[in-house]
Amino acid sequence: LCDRYGVDALRYFLLREIPFGNDGIFSNEALINRINADLANDLGNLLSRSVAMIEKYFGGTLPAQRKAEPLDDELAAMVEALPAKVTACMDVLQVPNALAEIFRVIQRANKYIDETAPWVLAKDEANLPRLAAVLYNLCEVLRVAAVLLTPFLPNTTPKMAQQLGLTAESMRFETLGR
């Protein structure tokens, strides 16, 4: 299984699907469905789209000038609350719930892309500060998710950090909420 799907994907599936200390049901179909839904469609899609848009619209580097809007507040609040939610779940060994919390924010970020339509913003140079804010928010979701997913996906998250151009310091748990 590890050779076919990868250690991180298998570890993620087992931790996401089987509550700690309990028996669980395994099937190849369930494994493939979870990998496709969470890791490929949600996380992979968010990372791929975000990195591609930063490269396409800003040459790989986000400008400092950004224009935030009220639509950003919900996503920012979810990201800010996420480390405490994950920690609370982990404190009582509710690993599947911790992972569900992380992926709830990732799913919200994918919806945020559709709501903010960065490809439309990019058509007008006057919207570039707004576009920068949208892409910054997506990068922050990905950074926080990568930090929180590191214990579960230790081979995957360094690759995410590299694609996002994150420093080792920004990948430390202690940096969350700053």
Question: Each PLM stretch: what is its role?
Answer:
Residues G24, A88, L93-Q94, F103-R178:
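Basic, alpha-helical terminal appendages of large translation-related enzymes
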Residues A9, A30, E74, M78, ...:
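Exposed alpha-helical structural elements
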Residues P19, A37, P63, P70, ...:
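Proline-rich intrinsically disordered, low-complexity coils
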